[in-house]
């Protein structure tokens, strides 16, 4: 397998040398076919990799219509199902056995199912996972190749996602277990060409999963594997060359991962920005280089593009010891660490010598977004990062940030808070009150989901993260709510998504079903869905699904995304600095093809002022109780 295919892409795109050692391994794109083992060349029709020179129409293409297989040329096979009733019963049983990792019991059923009916990608996928569980690697490969050719949407299975690029990684892992490095790397590269979105998992640098992938242990130190994994760093690079290597890698991952990288910036302008950053690297500090990378991502023009500059080995940021929120009447301090808690509740009038509104406007260049509600949500987060403030000219020096605050009487106070190393546990949510009892919507907004029965049979459900809890899956939680509805304990229902910025959208279906069940059993009952600036990504998709299937009443602010939007978080980890971030890898259409709304607008618009927040009031729930009682 030729090495440094990816390095060829990076250096070929931008004309920026990395090192002579790397250049010795560059290959011509015409030779790419040689990288495919002959016996594998016809197993899959893959979308054409985006290799070439910047400035071609190919690079500006929207990748959302690309497919990893072909529906043309694969004729349906003969159906050999003698007893359809028994077939269906066995299909249900076999998939459930596979879900519970009862591989030995699932295996004969799935073998029979795929013999009787060969055109169901779901059963081939379940059989492939079963063979993987039984360490029958060659059999797993054959089953997964069939699943890949047919396609599947069988989710909730252990050890493998149903997306085509995830299946390609499973194929690579099977070859890895067989110590076949060439075929393993071939399938890794196929997955990368199909925009596989968690490349750091290969190198053990994933944001969510620590440790290297054990399936590739036999050759994890080889240069070819490290190139595919994105962890290779040429030796004897200078500091500036190493940062340029990261820049090339980031630009290449934008080109590989982003579903439509040039919808907001031209190819030529993007190339110029990369060249400008490369030229300036010798004069920039490590933190300033990471800021320049943030600005590069900021040109992409949609919300799932950012760096989290908290976990890198080089260039990680500091932050101010306080959190801000943009209320209807301005930017305020909502929480702070000691000794700055006395400033909670104060309005931010100036950042350095610049007015807060002007500073917030400048933040837009590092805050790629789906709409301007996302600016309301995330601009306060960026205000808390001194390197961003310095890079945008809001302050002169990142280590000397001053804030002008005003209290409720209008008195002004100039403070210079001491910066601290950056920590990150997710983008900020509006916190509970620092003093006194918090209102219902702020009490447990770091818990994934919970509910409370309110007077007059009003059920309040707060859904904050689209992710399973260890103690109770989202499906189990939804079933618990469904039982309350069935038992007649709910007259009206509230689903609060104001703190929910997303997660795993494949988990949403049970909650959608819960809202549909409520409307079916309580046709005169009111279903309220609360939305706002934080309602984003998988949570936004949930809100769209509910509004398509029910007559839910939307209450709050406009949402933080669009019905049809470039979305999905494709993770990257830079080889030198180890900075982590995401790039938008998919287009999600939850509205009609011609749904051009810039957000989901509430039926009952309600804003939140600083006075209401600090008094512990929730004007959204006040409005709902008023409507519910009618």
Model-derived segments and spans:
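Flexible, low-complexity junctional segments that flank or bridge functional domains
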Residues: 21, 45, 57, 69-82, ...
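Conserved acidic, small-residue-rich alpha-beta core segments centered on
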Residues: 346, 487-494, 498-629
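Register position in tetratricopeptide repeats
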Residues: 99-100, 133, 177
